[in-house]
Design a protein with these regions (language model features):
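Positively charged n-region of N-terminal signal peptides that target proteins for export
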Residues: 2-4
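Bacterial N-terminal signal peptides
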Residues: 7-16
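Sequence/structural segment immediately N-terminal to covalent heme-attachment motifs in c-type
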Residues: 22-47, 110, 117-140, 155
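Extracytoplasmic/secreted proteins, especially bacterial periplasmic and envelope-associated proteins
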Residues: 31, 35, 65, 82-85, ...
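C-type cytochrome heme c attachment motif
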Residues: 36-45, 64, 68-71, 96-100, ...
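Inter-heme linker and motif-flanking segments adjacent to c-type heme-binding CXXCH motifs
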Residues: 49-50, 79, 104-116, 120, ...
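C-terminal capping alpha-helices of c-type cytochrome domains
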Residues: 88-111, 157, 183-207
Length: 207
């Protein structure tokens, strides 16, 4: 009940922020491109594709999801020392400006893996993704939508961490959907899901 109430408070606050966002990501304030380069690029990459461990790729991410995460960091509801320190310097206009700019970053493909994906593990991962409704919420190509993050091309180590934190309750969400989705998934299955999602290629799945 406590977690549900907290989610409701977050949802209400984010709705207010979202209503003030511009209708199209292409209308992003160009000043935030420079601020992204100076504030965010060192960790997340100039093009939104990070090479640092446990650091998410931002390229291709949706503005509403981005503003949600910045809000959670700013309000201390999502824990990360570095991100919290940065987000606490942002006002509501900054949250909107950065999230709108992030949404303009084109998708940067993940580097080719050193070895071909393990076919059996990919099949297991796909079965788990179907069983636990990953495609139903995040889309057939895992590209997500405004309130649902893009997963395709995300770093495997970051996916592992995120899934583990949702399962443990450490990671908050806009809703309780993710916590419920992974509540009965074993740690080993979470690793298999992360392995699959990080290597998922929609066209390859259709062949």
């Amino acid at each position: 009940l406590k977690r549900a109430c907290a989610a409701a408070v977050v949802a209400a606050a984010l709705s207010t922020l979202a209503l003030a966002q511009k209708p199209a990501a292409s209308a992003a304030n160009p000043g935030y491109a420079q601020r992204f380069a100076s504030v965010c690029a060192a960790c997340h990459g100039a093009n939104g594709r990070s090479e640092l461990p446990l650091t998410p790729a931002l390229s291709g991410q949706h503005s509403f999801y981005a503003i949600t995460q910045l809000f959670l960091f700013r309000e201390g509801r999502r824990g990360h020392e570095g991100m919290t320190a940065i987000a606490k310097t942002m006002n509501d206009a900054d949250l909107r400006g950065f999230s709108e700019f992030i949404a303009t970053l084109p998708v940067v493909p993940a580097p080719a893996p050193a070895t071909p994906p393990d076919a059996a593990r990919m099949a297991n991962g796909q079965a788990l993704a179907q069983q636990h409704k990953c495609f139903a919420c995040h889309g057939a190509d895992l590209s997500g939508g405004q309130q649902v993050p893009r997963l395709a091309q995300q770093r495997e180590d970051y996916l592992q961490l995120t899934l583990q934190e949702f399962k443990s309750g450490k990671r908050p969400g806009y809703t309780m959907a993710m916590g419920e989705a992974v509540s009965r998934v074993t740690p080993e299955e979470l690793d298999t899901l992360a392995y699959f999602i990080a290597r998922f290629a929609p066209q390859a799945q259709k062949k």
